[in-house]
């Protein structure tokens, strides 16, 4: 068999990736990829992912890779453009009543599941019930959902007890996937084998998952969007090593990787490889702000003068440069400017970089320098999920040493980090990500709302912050249907937390996608590569 350069490189890369995988799995993986190459006639896209997802359907697991692989097979009612405006997917039209309590969706006709059965309103009803019961955010997102009905097979009506203005933004494939009701039972949904071999309505059909190696999807020839997808074979390659991902992109055996697939320090060197390009679009529904969070149960950190001093000691421009190599925007407020310009509070930093001021505030707070110049010591736990958080933590340690605060860094695996910070509350400071997600009520209420504090739930009010006015504003915004009034509520909330700083917002991180220039139309929605990639196109590079 004559091998093209692309096929040869792809197979060479696969052999490297499968070192340590059992022989039978290596053989199966090699055979499947060779077959895909023969059948596709060049219409193959290799997508690097890490870590390997635990499941391939995102209704009960919202890890980044689960969402990425799920949404190609299992779709949502809606998708969203980069301004977070709803667009049709499995629903072609929708109407929200004036009181915000009734949502009516018209479903796309003549859509079939990959097993040939018709898609109907029964699938939507089951899927929303499953999301409310099993999704990590489902009980909150659908808390006000009282009743679902189907007036006919292509109409679904939701009835709410109270308005939920964020609900219309929660219906993407990655957040609320629509599952085949005829293949699931609600009480056994988590154990269904289809979670690892999904059947959906999407542009790609599941073919195989060789654990530790790859997930292989093929084009759905019966997809409802005529002429799409154009890609014949989509292969998600599990590549935990960043050097391997970088080399794969360079040698063309990998076509694309998202969520900063290579060290950001390497991005400037990509100009040496003209077939590669970088995009920061397609992350608008999951904007992450790097933040320094305080444990307000610590006596010294409960003192606002100490928190103000720490804020004055931090140079956001340096963090942008050192921790994120420029792929970030400095910010003071916790709501993303890029994703929610109407909700973002554009405010001057009340605690600008000023080391002299920081030192004076610590003296005023009753923490004079002792022998050796030290005032007191703190521990700092860095969230391991993003290398930029770890680099930010190192910068914070250095910056605080200049004002006499001795910081001990704790770098841990994800499980240990969650136990130390959220379960056992052993931290003084933590550098982590605060995400507005697809709506501030969903993303930020868990961080700043006093009733969100729960040591059993990670990433929920680690500060143990309590401000009655903040609670009131967040509660009001959660049910406000007038967007202008809702914006005022969110801005008033930000005004308070920017001045009280239970958390110091530092920089909004840019998601980075590295891709072969032959690819296009993968970053046109707010979800980007986490969307269904139905429009993904292949040219030459």
Segments (PLM) and residue ranges:
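Gly/Pro-rich hinge or "lid" segments in bacterial periplasmic/extracellular proteins
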Residues: 81-85, 172-229, 233, 356-360, ...
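Extracytoplasmic/peripheral linker and loop segments enriched in polar/acidic and small residues
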Residues: 305, 320, 406-418, 423-425, ...
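Ligand/substrate-recognition segments at binding pockets and active sites
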Residues: 211, 258, 340, 363-437, ...
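N-terminal lobe/hinge region of extracytoplasmic solute-binding protein
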Residues: 48-98, 126-129, 140-142, 199-201, ...
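Long beta-strand-rich cores associated with HINT superfamily self-processing modules
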Residues: 513-541
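Extracellular/periplasmic solute-recognition and catalytic clefts
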Residues: 147-149, 207-218, 235-298, 317, ...
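Structural transition elements
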Residues: 330-365, 384-392
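Surface-exposed binding/hinge segments that line
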Residues: 106, 140-184
